[in-house]
Amino acid sequence: MSKQRLNNLFFFLGIAAVIVMLFTFDVSFVELWEHICHAGYWLIPIVGVWIIIYGINALSWREIIRSKTASSPEESGKPGFWRIFRLTITGYALNYATPVGGLGGEPYRILELSKDISGQHAASSVILYAMMHFFAHFWFWFSSIFIYLGLAAIGDLPINTAIATVLGIIIVFCLIFFWIFSRGYRKGLVVSTLHLLGRIPGLKGWSGCQLEKRGETFRNIDQQIASLYAEDKRAFYRSLVLEYLSRVVQSSEVLFMLLLFGIDCGGGFTGITLTYLHAILIVSFTTLFANLIGFLPMQLGVQEGGFVLSIAALGLSAALGIFVSIICRVREIIWIVVGILLMKLK
């Protein structure tokens, strides 16, 4: 299949996803419109802040693409920021849309990026960025535990045996994956993943065939993955910090919705700061919940349930959780539309 046909396939997949999402809201169109009207002008910063978030994501990805271990003199300065920014938005739009939740945008990014740089460089940079995206997630979840404990220490949030147990499980969960990521960054990930898939009944033949045909290519990609951390730690940590920062900025959309409902912890600088920390915890728990069940197409129902549970855990009303989940779904649809339109922008 030609690259143009694949591009068209991704384009129509995105359109189909928007249609499905419009008809799978848990509320009627009348109720949906009421929620949008309730958001009012707050919808502008809620949607608009994602320009900043995607911009930070693009800067993080650019650090990987332009790292001294991956780029060659012929590829110096390629691709430009605007190109990376567009592919970032479109990639995430496809991630929201595809049945393999959170992974559908990667093949498209490799396909498009290979027009600017070598295929191996494109594949390794996309894989590295996907790893960095998830790695930053774990650091976000891990640090959120200490935010919760800090707020509990000042009496702002409850703490008991059940909550402490859950927090302890999350800490262990994060530490295990920190170890897995450390191995991936030291030795690469592609070949080991194919070997692992080969142990699954029915996939042994396919895995062996891929290693036989493209083994050298996969080993070269793994070498580029491993060399980022080993030889260009500055680019690695800059990319990680930027990805982590994007999660913090993402929490501002929940902050806007809390302020919309008059929830500001007493107002003033201290009150707004506490509210922002609550927003970070809400986003952290919701994204953890959504990623644990991330295989669902468009994470239907998962994000909504995560918002309701996380908001209720902070002692806020379930109605607020439903409102936040619906407005976030509206924001996703808007950005999916933007993403698929950018696919056709030359």
PLM regions with names:
Residues 81-83, 116-131, 317-327:
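Membrane-interface alpha-helices at helix entry/exit sites of multi-pass transporters
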